Amino acid sequence: MNNVTQWTVPIDHPSFAGHFPGNPTLPGVVLLDVALHSIAKAIGHSLDVCEIKSVKFLSPTLPNDPLVIEHRQLESGIIHFDIVCGPRKIATGRIMINSPESTPTV
C-alpha cells in the first residue's frame, strides 16, 4: 500500500517564531507530527500508540515548502515513510503500530 499526502508549510506556522529567528526552520518534532497525522488519517487508525523505530532528518524545512509525505506498510507491519520537497529528501522513518493491549503500563 502506497499513500501520498501533500502539505505546504504555512509561512505563519507558530513554530517559526522561535525556531531560528531570521532563519525560520520547521522543527523536526513538528515535521514528525505532521507525518504521523497524515499516516493515521490515510490508514484510518490512531497512531497514539506506536513505536518510532527510526527517523532521520536530512534537510531543513522552510516556510512555504511544498512537502510530499509518502508511506507504505511493509510485510513486517512496519510503516516506512519519506518526506520530500521536490528533489530534496527532507526526512525518512519507520514506525510500528502497537495495539493498546501490547503497550506496557508504567
Each language-model region and where it sits:
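A generic hydrophobic-segment detector
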Residues: 1, 42, 46, 53, ...
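Catalytic strand-loop segment that frames the active site of acyl-thioester-processing enzymes
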Residues: 1-26
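Generic structural signal for short, solvent-exposed loop/turn connectors between secondary structure elements
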Residues: 1-6, 41-49, 72-79
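HotDog/MaoC-like acyl-thioester-processing domains
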Residues: 3, 72-106
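Hydrophobic residues in beta-strands and at strand termini
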Residues: 9-11, 57, 97
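Surface-exposed loop/turn and secondary-structure junction residues enriched for glycine/proline
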Residues: 19, 23, 29, 58-60, ...
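Active-site helix/loop of acyl-thioester processing domains in fatty-acid/polyketide metabolism
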Residues: 25-48
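Hydrophobic beta-sheet segments that form the core/acyl-binding groove
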Residues: 50, 54-87
